[in-house]
Amino acid sequence: MLDGMLIALARMEPEERLEQVARFVPRMDNWAVCDTFCTSLKFCKKHPALVWEFIQPYLTSARVYDVRFAVVMMLAHFITEDYVEQVLALLDGVRHEDYYVGMAVAWAVSVCYVKFPALTLEYLRNSSLSDFTYNRALQKIIESLRVSREDKSLMRSMKRR
């Protein structure tokens, strides 16, 4: 965890930071380190195209925390008007069956819904998410304090049985 914080906070060029990130990601072995690391990488805001390109290969890795890293990076830095459609398309393509990957995808979908409800609702109606991930995403939306009572009722009606 300390190594991750140093990578996030030390002064360095973005390319050097991404080299350090690439060395650190394989050492992640739990969701807390992964999520804290991803959310602490504030340089992403200044270099979105570079970071976006960097995280793409991690989405198809066989390693749990490689995939979670990419998903949490998208959720922390790319649920924006410029990237949300691409984020949803990529989330729909995540096929790793691990619990921690599914939960990260569900979390990301719920944040998409909070920020872009109409777009995410359309996505949910047509997504190919696993039943587990889809229902977890709905549950996270229902639990959100930033979603209306009416939208929560709609989410309850959309659950897959």
Describe the function of each predicted region:
Residues 1-161:
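Alpha-helical scaffold domains
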